[in-house]
Swiss-Prot record:
Signal peptide: none annotated. The keyword ATP-binding does not apply. The keyword Protease applies. The gene is pepA. It comes from Burkholderia vietnamiensis (strain G4 / LMG 22486) (Burkholderia cepacia (strain R1808)). This is Probable cytosol aminopeptidase. GO terms for cellular component: cytoplasm.
Length: 503
């Protein structure tokens, strides 16, 4: 799909090109109380009051997300007009904009429209410019057009005809909007990879498959990939990671992916993604109902790989290292048992009280491994706890960090990217729940504050660098009729790296 940017100040009569240029449809916003947006006012004049008449007749009340096609419109180059309700003008925010953009794309994708002129990006949204509107609109469109068909014997072809979108933007934002469009496409491509990996079944997306995906990313985008096998992992003394992997016939992999966009001496940001390609719970077996969704337990790994693809396509001037410990968590005659004690790469001994708290066991060795890169920051991403889902639901990812500056950067990125996160506590008092009578630390801390104690466990392995943990158990995928991976938190991670790179 082709995206292009054209500057236009509708209030200064600069709209001639949009009024006369050929297009299948022009998208206009209408607020409640019959208020027309700037572009809608110009189109209304050119069509001799058509928009006003439609609004006054009550056919378009401006309620958020409502759409109305006006066919065979005369006086402008576009053959059709799509009116989109924006809701109340004084309540028009990021969510209202995304709702309006999504409603517009859904209406357009259900038609044979091939070329669209999109004016909503110029609407004022929380003091953001048109470039933000362009990026958000492209991501909303790509979200609507995403389909997972890899496992279908006869995939259905795309049903829409949309090929080209022309965005009208404020002239002062034109350069930034062009960059935003390129970044949005790269980001959407990264999210698509993340969603594809998550949606693949566990018998396809194995640890070896993730390793091969990393190698392909390296080949396609000029990255450097290292994929360590069982013997190399054993040589590194990653006893905690291996305690999870041991009962599966699928060999574990330890993936390290390097992107160098800055000087070699510049400290990298390290992203660590949990890669449990299927989680049965091990000996602490999960209930059968809903266990199929445990293929999504590698979404941390998928989001890290998707972010690396996006970063490489954007060409960010920053160094990034991705680390993915990946294996299955299976029961078996040689599986780790509740009460077993294992030794981590750091040397700390861990009493495994519950084998279904395995994510932290593979992440802790990866976090220790990250020390060798002398990182500027380390962010781990994991579908770590059901407790985080109970606490935050499916809207906010849980953000844990003792570093206020790093946490602030990530929260700013989450707001800019419309990829919500909420900072959770990480007080030292919670560490007491992880005490063990027999080892240095237990892998669970009981039912109270389960998401917090999981993060506290990880914090024991991150003392040498700035660190943050994102628990995406509630945001990485959706259940029910809309079941599927979401691609989150790729937007948050990518925006954080864009900000760090100053781009």
């Amino acid at each position: 799909m082709d995206f292009s940017i054209k500057g236009c100040d509708w209030s200064k009569g600069e709209a001639k090109g949009f009024l006369t240029g050929k297009s299948d449809c022009i998208v206009l916003g209408i607020f409640e109380a019959q208020t027309l947006s700037g572009a809608a006012l110009d189109i209304d004049t050119a069509t001799k009051g058509l928009i006003s008449r439609v609004v006054k007749a009550g056919d378009m009340d401006g309620k958020r997300g409502k759409t109305l096609f006006l066919p065979e419109v005369s006086g402008i180059g576009a053959s059709r007009v799509l009116l989109v309700g924006l809701g109340k003008q004084d309540a028009f925010n990021q969510k209202a904009y995304n709702d309006a953009a999504t409603a517009a794309w859904r209406a357009l994708l259900a038609t044979k429209v091939g070329q669209v002129t999109f004016t909503l990006a110029q609407l004022p949204v929380d003091e953001r410019g048109s470039d933000w509107g362009v990026r958000a609109a492209i991501l909303a469109l790509r979200n609507e057009t995403y389909r997972f068909t890899q496992m279908k014997s006869k995939p259905e072809p795309a049903s829409h005809a949309l090929k080209r979108v022309v965005f009208s933007v404020d002239p002062s934002d034109e350069k930034a909007a062009k960059l935003a469009a390129k970044q949005a496409v790269a980001l959407a491509n990264g999210m698509d990879l993340t969603r594809d990996l998550g949606n693949l079944p566990g018998n396809v997306c194995t640890p070896t498959y993730l390793g091969n995906t990393a190698k392909k990313l390296a080949k396609d985008w000029g990255l450097k990939a290292e994929v360590l096998g069982l013997k190399q992992i054993q040589a590194l003394k990653m006893g905690s990671f291996l305690s999870v992997a041991r009962a599966s016939v699928e060999p574990p992999q330890f993936i390290v992916l390097h992107y160098q966009g800055a000087a070699a001496k510049a400290a990298p940001v390290v992203l660590v993604g949990k890669g449990i390609t299927f989680d049965t719970g091990g000996i602490s077996l999960k209930p059968g109902e809903g266990m199929d969704e445990m293929k999504y337990d590698m979404c941390g790994a998928g989001s890290v790989l998707g972010t690396m693809r996006a970063v490489a396509e954007m060409g960010l001037k920053i160094n990034v290292v991705a680390i993915v410990p990946t294996c299955e968590n299976m029961p078996g005659g040689n599986a780790t048992k509740p009460g077993d004690i294992v030794t981590s790469m750091k040397g700390l001994t861990i009493e495994v009280l519950n084998t279904d708290a395995e994510g932290r066991l593979i992440l802790c060795d990866a976090l220790t491994y990250a020390e060798r890169f002398k990182p500027a920051a380390v962010i781990d991403v994991a579908t770590l706890t059901g407790a985080c889902v109970i606490a935050l639901g499916g809207h906010n990812s849980g953000l844990f960090s003792k570093d206020d500056a790093l946490a602030g950067e990530l929260l700013d990125a989450s707001r800019e990217a419309n990829d919500a996160a909420w900072r959770m506590p990480l007080d030292d008092e919670y560490q007491d729940q992880l005490k063990s009578n027999f080892a240095d630390i237990a892998n669970i801390g009981g039912r109270p504050a389960g998401a917090v104690t999981a993060a506290c466990f990880l914090s024991r392995f991150t003392e040498s660098y700035p660190w943050a943990h994102l628990d995406i158990a509630g945001t990485a995928w959706k259940s029910g009729a809309a079941k599927g991976a979401t691609g989150r938190p790729v937007p948050l991670l990518a925006q954080f790296l864009i900000d760090r790179a100053g781009q």
